[in-house]
From Swiss-Prot:
Its EC number is 2.7.4.6. It comes from Delftia acidovorans (strain DSM 14801 / SPH-1). The gene is ndk. GO terms for biological process: CTP biosynthetic process; GTP biosynthetic process; UTP biosynthetic process. Its cofactor is Mg(2+). It is found in: Cytoplasm. It comes from the Bacteria. Homotetramer. Keywords: ATP-binding, Cytoplasm, Kinase, Magnesium, Metal-binding, Nucleotide metabolism, Nucleotide-binding, Phosphoprotein, Transferase. This is Nucleoside diphosphate kinase. InterPro entries: NDK-like_dom, NDK-like_dom_sf, Nucleoside_diP_kinase.
Length: 141
């Protein structure tokens, strides 16, 4: 099994619900290590740049508006098959379709306010981790 890194963002809705610790416990329970973390309030420019891949999609403006609506908790996770494990923990994008016991089923309200973001592939994970944690801010342990 490969040790991977992935990016996770706990979105403004979940931060406002004060469930960061509960979500971290799920990461750790699945064998994922938090190797970098910070709480930030994204600027519109940061959110637009980070989600730039979706720029032409009809939901782009609403996504950016939501991501700048309050603080987010950003973390790099590391572990065996970290990308897939994190995506399984998150559940389906639409919390109404997410399996019971997933982060989105338990903490998200809608497809827009869906509690968490997670990298979808190794290539995007590398880009996303570097976006928020450039250089020496990531510590394997």
């Amino acid at each position: 099994m490969a040790i991977e890194r992935t990016l996770s963002i706990i979105k403004p809705d979940a931060v406002a619900k004060n469930v960061i610790g509960q979500i971290y416990a799920r990461f750790e329970g699945a064998g994922l290590k938090v190797i970098a973390a910070k709480m930030v309030h994204l600027s519109r420019g940061e959110a637009e740049q980070f989600y730039g891949v979706h720029k032409e999609r009809p939901f782009f403006k609403d996504l950016v508006d939501f991501m700048v609506s309050g603080p987010v908790m950003i973390q790099a996770l590391e572990g065996e098959n970290a990308i897939l494990k994190n995506r399984e923990l998150m559940g389906a994008t639409d919390p109404k379709k997410a399996e019971k016991g997933t982060i989105r089923a338990d903490f998200a309200d809608s497809i827009d306010a869906n509690a968490v973001h997670g990298s979808d592939a190794a290539e995007t994970a590398a880009v996303e981790v570097a976006f928020f944690f450039p250089g020496m801010n990531v510590y394997s342990r």
